[in-house]
Amino acid sequence: MNMRDLRDGHDTQKVPPRRSARQMWAVRVAWLLLALVAALYCAWRFAGPSPLQTDLLALLPATEADPVAEKAVDTLASALGDRTVLLVTSNDDAHAKAAAKQLGASLQKSGAFGSVTAELPPFDLAQIAALYMPYRFGLLAPVDRAALAGGATGSSSTTLRDTLAQRIYSPLNGGLTTPLADDPFGWLQRWLGGLPLATSNLEVEDNLLVAHRGAATSVLIVATLPGSAYETKTQRAVHAALAQSESALRQAFPDVSVARTGAVFYAESARSAAEREVHLIGVASLCGIALLMLWVFRSPRLLLLGFVSTALGIVCALAVTLLVFGKLHLLTLVFGASLIGEAVDYSIQYFVVYLGAQRDWDARRGARTVRPALTVALLTSLLGYAILMWVPFPALRQIACFAMVGITTAFASVLWLLPALLTRAPKRSPQRVFLGAARLLALWRRAIGGRRAAYVTALLLLVAIPGWLRLTSDDDIHLLIQRDPSLVAQEDKVRDAVGVDNSAQFFVVRGDTPEAVLQHAEALDVQLDALDGTANQVGAYQSVTQFVPSAKQQSEDRALLAKRVFDNPAALRATLLQAGFKDQVADAWLAAYAQAQAQPPLGVERWLAAPWSQPYRHLWLGEVDSATHAYAAVVIPQGVTPRNEPALLALAQRLPGVTFVDKAASVSKLFGAYRVDSGWWLGGALALVLVLLTMRYAPKEVPLGRAPKEVPSGHAPQKVPLRNRLRGGIATTLPVALAVGVTLAIFGYARVPLNLFNWLALMLVLGVGANYAVFLREGCLRADADLGAVWTGVLLSAATTLLSFGMLGMSAMPALKSFGATLALGIAVAVLLAPIGMPSESRRAA
């Protein structure tokens, strides 16, 4: 439909022929089939694995410039997301340990977990030394490397004798030790001492991981999930298993407490909260809208038809969103529940025309009457939602798709389905309501419309400007993702007991080969070590190169030993014999060195194959991009603070293949960039709405001295001045433009910091709020329109929308809360100012 068709729609007097009963039934059956197909598809999707997404990371866009780094972030999140940690605590040491064993056995028996580790299997630390023993001549601790490299040629034998004597006569050391015959100088033992095995407060007692803090004893239980932490089936199984096991535990050990942490608990909490909100918002919106429509229309039949149109929109929106995206995020589901108030607007406008026609009702003529207003309203709403499609946030794209399909389906059902269902004239009409609304509109229009609109605009701008100057922003992503406080407290308790901080920052190291990754990681390790003793130092860090040095480093260590130690085998053998080693022991050690020269260096695959490496395997991400054969690893520092983070970021920028990742900071930065861009998008969208409404409401060209309805064919038209051509579009756009400005001013005066979601909500204020002035102006363009009925429809539409989005403003999800509050405030102002868009009495015919 083009603009000329829209402009001429209200002048069309020709009444189309009535549809036959067969045509009516064909339309009804077609819509019924559409509804059945959409409903059956949704039922099929929800009958299998749940398509609901509870992963908060799914809300976020890619933030890393390097796609390999982005994939590394996802891989690490997936690896850590399937772990669940439980902490059993009591002031009675025996109770804590017994309770942990009972809880571990109960959870393992439940089948809800892939594995549960409470009691550690007997483990000999010699297994760790056994892995490295064949490669010991390429593994030197930094202190030994420095001693060998820094010694003068003549002093090397003296250094070796001192090292050998210290090794022989030093007291026995705990931890990882090596046999004297296999490691006479202690090089491997010192290298093993540098492994980051004990980076927590945990100790092994009675085959349990135990932490002591004051009088409390805490025992750690680690479990893995059989599926994704974000699958509803997994969440429910874990929840049920824990509830049953903890109930039995409280009966046996009343003094024991259990803290938990893991992605599955946050995901389950988010899903449950979202389901509660969907029910609350959906039921409250339905009940509120039903009461409003019954109060105004006094017709259960109209109420039912309105909800039929709305239900069609929501079911089709749900089906299309699942079809396009494959998944449905909880944020989209909650927003979809609030779409009820907007989707029912189109039905309300149709019902107002229906009741206003009284005995002269013709269903198809009624559809033609409301078509121009609904089409303009649909286009402005689609414009607001279409802008969300351009934002690279998956959840916002889902919301935009859901809303666009929903309101388009509701629009189509009003024009084609309702005329087939609403064929009989109304038995009664709420004329008293319409008359009261007409008087209210006349009073309010005299107060703010006509010539006074300019003064109202100037006054609002004068009041708003100081508020704009007080506007602030806060793009911190943590303010937009609400986590269950109880779960956060339990996570903090686990971290405090274990002794690991809450740092979510890490380095991603990439390379074209595993060797390149290891070399880049070693360069990073050197730089991190260099920060010790400075203001920018970090605590301990974990790096895969602490377990597997690069082949280059191992070759250099071999070369150093060959130059400084094994350059004179006879002298070395004599040194060993003088220290008391037997001939066969010295010969065996020298032979082992000779054999080691022919074997390849230690590789990552060999280390990964060792069972004891399991707790550290997340440090090696392996091949993250098969197309480019890119490999990656992570280096995780402890003690990252706002003070030293800039130094770490600068360090990563200096090193090849190294990226410092702070997902929260990256997303916050991206939020800020798009928040700034949103202001330009809003201005551009406002300009497009102005153009659209100007094309719709520009007066026609008429011959000089003729009224518009007096135009005979063949007369040359008179040019309409530019000001007059723009007047209608400006007047209709002005209410929503002022609504946006007033909303921003209120946030400024209230010192509420703005974020991206506030600005995106203003886009929808523009798209939805413009409808009210459009509905009023379209009513003025219809000669037979009852403006009281039109104003009733506008107020009812605004009330239903405010009800839905007002409920959204009470959401526990901060993103939706700011979204809904902004929408509700903007729409309230837009409907109050809508009469500004009405033409004066002298121009109504134009």
Locate the predicted segments by residue.
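Hydrophobic transmembrane alpha-helices and their membrane-interface caps
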Residues: L303-Q349, P721, R725-F775
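Juxtamembrane segments of multi-pass membrane proteins
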Residues: G450-Q578
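Pore- and gate-forming transmembrane helices of large, multi-pass membrane proteins
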Residues: F307, R359-V391, A783-S811
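Signature of alpha-helical transmembrane segments and their immediate interfacial
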Residues: N2-R7, Q13-T54, P419-A420, R424, ...
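Transmembrane alpha-helices and their membrane-interface boundaries in multi-pass membrane transporters
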Residues: L323, L333, L339-L355, R371, ...
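Extracytoplasmic
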Residues: T63-V68, P121-W295, S299, V544-L690, L722
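Solvent-exposed, non-transmembrane loop/terminal regulatory segments of multi-pass membrane proteins
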Residues: A43-N91, L197-L209, R446-G449, A454, ...
